[in-house]
């Protein structure tokens, strides 16, 4: 398989709740995120996507993994995605200072949730949501 697509998902966290948005094109609840740009690291893409889709800057907690692991990284997943080939997604958690969101055309509704119960979203989003809620907070 020669084609690959790289993306990030950012679970923005504030006051014990995590932000999910209802994605217009995909029609389901997801964290904010998107594809990496040409010369971006996954963490740089996560910071950019969070700001673009919410207007918020986040603090990505350090020390969640092995030395060399990007701050805030809580998971990695891959799957085949049609013409894109292998889709590789890096999932992050970021502590944000507010629940006030800038409007974004990519989503139609936003919710701050405290758990996966009752959510109409993919199973991997439920699993990562639990990890995001349990991850240590950033230290400033």
Positions of the model-derived regions?
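NUDIX/MutT-family hydrolases
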Residues: 90-93, 100-134
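Short, solvent-exposed aromatic-acidic interface loops
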Residues: 24-26, 68, 108-111
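Active-site segment of metal-dependent pyrophosphate-handling enzymes
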Residues: 55-99
């Amino acid at each position: 398989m020669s084609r690959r697509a790289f993306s990030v998902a950012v679970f923005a966290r504030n006051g014990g709740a995590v932000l999910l948005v209802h994605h217009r094109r995909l029609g389901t609840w997801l964290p904010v995120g998107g594809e990496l740009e040409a010369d971006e690291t996954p963490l740089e893409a996560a910071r950019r996507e969070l700001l673009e889709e919410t207007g918020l800057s986040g603090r990505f907690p350090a020390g969640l993994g092995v030395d060399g692991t990007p701050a805030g990284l809580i998971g990695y997943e891959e799957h085949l995605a049609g013409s894109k080939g292998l889709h590789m997604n890096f999932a992050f958690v970021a502590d944000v200072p507010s629940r006030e969101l800038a409007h974004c055309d990519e989503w139609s509704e936003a919710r701050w949730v405290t758990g996966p119960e009752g959510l109409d979203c993919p199973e991997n989003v439920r699993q990562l949501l639990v990890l995001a809620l349990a991850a240590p907070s950033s230290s400033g």
